[in-house]
């Protein structure tokens, strides 16, 4: 089993990228290959998961360890295979995905590619309470608590995500507050003031 591969991205197609490591080109199936277009002919570290089938050995690649954990959670659901899991991750709506699972919003879940009503219900059954989004809006973390260093700030950012604020906005706000100490409530009040300006 591989944790990650480090090498040069040599090719990007609609379904995969090629990562060359020690003279070997690995085909890595990724959620959004074009997200790597700025890294062609540059070194990259891609987290991987290997799937072995009778007819093929496939490698799936991820931008972060958290994205890989989300993928593994998704493929643990009956009815979701690796291709469907990548399609869900490619939608780049991890906060919406988690919220829909927690609120049992089947209609929302069926908007993801290749997810029907039965599969959406199975997702809720299997993943409810097990998948949370990191407070900075980066790819979802699976069953991970807020970091101990500033749990109040993490809780505030999660609450703001739940209110519908964009992860990109919150990432900037979180950086502004890093190194400070306050309550989650005060962080939210300050963040709202910053967003209204």
From Swiss-Prot:
Q: Which domain of life is it from?
A: Bacteria
**What is the protein's major site of localization?**
cytoplasm
So which residues are the signal peptide here? Answer: none
Cellular localisation:
Cytoplasm
According to the UniProt record, where is the region Domain I? Answer: 1-63
Q: Gene Ontology terms, cellular component aspect? A: cytoplasm; Holliday junction helicase complex; Holliday junction resolvase complex
List the residue ranges of the region (Domain III). 148-197
- A biological process (GO) annotation for this entry? DNA repair
Q: Which UniProt keywords apply?
A: Cytoplasm, DNA damage, DNA recombination, DNA repair, DNA-binding
Q: Where is region (Flexible linker) located?
A: 143-147
A single GO molecular function, which one? four-way junction DNA binding
Give positions of region: Domain II.
Answer: 64-142
Q: Which Gene3D superfamilies match?
A: 5' to 3' exonuclease, C-terminal subdomain (1.10.150.20), DNA helicase RuvA subunit, C-terminal domain (1.10.8.10), Nucleic acid-binding proteins (2.40.50.140)
Query: What InterPro entries is this protein classified in?
Result: DNA_helicase_Holl-junc_RuvA_I, Hlx-hairpin-Hlx_DNA-bd_motif, NA-bd_OB-fold, RuvA, RuvA_2-like, RuvA_C, RuvA_C_sf
- Keyword rRNA-binding on this protein? no
Instruction: Cite the record's note on assembly.
Output: Homotetramer. Forms an RuvA(8)-RuvB(12)-Holliday junction (HJ) complex. HJ DNA is sandwiched between 2 RuvA tetramers; dsDNA enters through RuvA and exits via RuvB. An RuvB hexamer assembles on each DNA strand where it exits the tetramer. Each RuvB hexamer is contacted by two RuvA subunits (via domain III) on 2 adjacent RuvB subunits; this complex drives branch migration. In the full resolvosome a probable DNA-RuvA(4)-RuvB(12)-RuvC(2) complex forms which resolves the HJ.
- Function, please? The RuvA-RuvB-RuvC complex processes Holliday junction (HJ) DNA during genetic recombination and DNA repair, while the RuvA-RuvB complex plays an important role in the rescue of blocked DNA replication forks via replication fork reversal (RFR). RuvA specifically binds to HJ cruciform DNA, conferring on it an open structure. The RuvB hexamer acts as an ATP-dependent pump, pulling dsDNA into and through the RuvAB complex. HJ branch migration allows RuvC to scan DNA until it finds its consensus sequence, where it cleaves and resolves the cruciform DNA.
Q: Domain comment? A: Has three domains with a flexible linker between the domains II and III and assumes an 'L' shape. Domain III is highly mobile and contacts RuvB.
Homology family:
Belongs to the RuvA family.
Query: What is the official name of this protein in its record?
Result: Holliday junction branch migration complex subunit RuvA
Q: What is the lineage of its organism?
A: Bacteria, Bacillati, Bacillota, Bacilli, Lactobacillales
């Amino acid at each position: 089993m591989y944790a990650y591969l480090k090498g040069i991205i040599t090719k990007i197609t609609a379904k995969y990228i090629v990562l060359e490591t020690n003279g070997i080109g690995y085909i890595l199936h990724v959620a959004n290959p074009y997200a790597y277009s700025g890294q062609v002919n540059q070194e990259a570290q891609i987290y991987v998961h290997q799937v072995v089938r009778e007819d093929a050995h496939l490698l799936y690649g991820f931008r972060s360890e958290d994205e890989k954990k989300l993928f593994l959670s998704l493929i643990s659901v009956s009815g979701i295979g690796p291709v469907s899991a990548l399609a869900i991750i490619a939608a780049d709506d991890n906060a919406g995905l988690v919220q829909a699972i927690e609120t049992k919003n089947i209609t929302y879940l069926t908007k993801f590619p290749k997810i029907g009503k039965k599969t959406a219900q199975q997702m809720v059954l299997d993943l409810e309470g097990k998948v949370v989004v990191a407070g900075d809006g980066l790819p979802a973390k699976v069953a991970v608590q807020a970091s101990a260093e500033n749990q109040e700030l993490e809780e505030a950012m999660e609450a703001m995500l739940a209110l519908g604020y964009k992860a990109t906005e919150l990432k900037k706000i979180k950086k502004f507050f890093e190194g400070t100490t306050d309550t989650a409530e005060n962080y939210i009040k300050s963040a709202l003031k910053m967003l209204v300006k």
